[in-house]
Amino acid sequence: LIISGMKKATYFSYLLFLPFFLLTIDQNQAFANSVIEEKPAKIIYALAAPFTTITDNISLRDFSDFWSGTSAVQSETIHGKLLIVTSDPERFKTLFGEGDKNQIEFVTDIHAALSQSINNGNWLIVPFDQLDARFKVISIDEQNPLHKDFNDNLWPLTIRINGNENMTEQDWAAVQPLNRDPSKLTTMILTGVTALVRGTAAYMDVWGPEYPASNIGDTLREADILHINNEVPFAKVCQQTESELARLVFCSKTSALEMLKSIGTDVVELDGDHFQDYGDDAVYYTLKLYKDANIPYYGGGANIKEAQKPLIVEDHGNKFAFIGCNGKEIGYAVASDTRPGAAHCDIPLIVSQIKELKASGILPIVTFQHIELYKIYPNEDMAADFKAVADAGAVIVSGSQSHIPMAFDISKDSFIHYGLGNLFFDQAFFLPETSEATLDRHIFYNGKHISTEILTIKFTNNALNRFMTESERTAVLNRIFAESHIELDQDEQ
């Protein structure tokens, strides 16, 4: 960068933001142009905490009081010193005041800050695009830069540079942030078990096919990419007998497809145990229904080649590849060269697919129909498969099979969730844990997985669920997080 002839004030402004400039290589040209030409610019910072933090929101008043040292918020929410990653503390002091040195600390080394946060639980203020999946973003007064309705002009951690005293709020509103471009932001919701059968189907027969999603449908529809793991085939004639149900042989009525369409399903996983329950004809019929509805599928297909083929999806400039397989002993609805069904897990093949996709700039998303365990942390076989594909480069590794919410293992480059629980299935009263589940809303920005929001749901009957109350959510997250792990990166050790 040539700086000769640069005005002194502009030069020092550039130096103050140099660490940010170096960290965000993909946006450095836009930033440099704004600084050198003294154009008004905005940089979005996020309030973040380790992923296993329970708190979701803090009021601006409590945040400001903590900053100034006039509040005991720390003992309830903010843990330890608040670490602000910046080389220009004065801009934050202009917003919030000098600050209590016992409460806040300005740091320039982002790796050291991330390490301290993971090891000690400190909260952070970091540039939005420097987030990674080991950290959750804390809302301030219910505003959150991960959300589609985010308004940077109402966000207290929006840093304005190169403005002048004549600029109005309307002028600033027209300035687009340098490090948060909505055209590069993708939200993806991954879900657990869907099986529109038995008790769930009975409610749908009475109240209509869209009934199970009555309380959560709007949230599902809002996702740019909604994943559904539908374990059961559709049948032209689906009239289940008591004998079939006793043997756990399932089918869904064709009308049930309307529910999947109504919630905006974008991709369907077909590696479930029950995919061949009604024979080859039902599988072919199911595949045709999805094709006619323009809902792409993966993990199952008309033959083994189709079942094993990664599904490529692109949204807001981010490219993804969905790969799915059944990790139980061979025989569960398995496809072959001549028969339709689910892909049995071939881990060496998946590892090679992941590496090839990653080299092409595509983000691999691997979902498993694996062993169904009614405990929080997986057994050795399950953990080995999940970690093998994570080590190969899978960005997300998600367990679609579990009937209860399970633990997480998260590194800088890979997010593992061993099981989410039921999305639509009639186990509300089987065990207390089977009435609980998560929806994992993953956020990607400019080709990078930057954060995940865990939405928690609870069943009220065998078909209908709702979002949890705060106390219900806290209890579930505490239980899951107690057996979850966050790893340091090599640069942070």
Regions found by a protein language model. Name each.
Residues 4-14:
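Bacterial N-terminal signal peptides that target proteins for export
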Residues 38-179:
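Exported/periplasmic ABC-transporter solute-binding proteins
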Residues 3-4, 26, 37, 355:
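Residues marking helix boundaries in flexible regions
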Residues 23-35:
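Sec-dependent signal peptide cleavage junction
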Residues 173-493:
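Acidic, metal/ion-coordinating pockets
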Residues 14-23:
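Bacterial N-terminal signal peptides
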Residues 2-3, 32-44:
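Generic N-terminal amphipathic/basic segments
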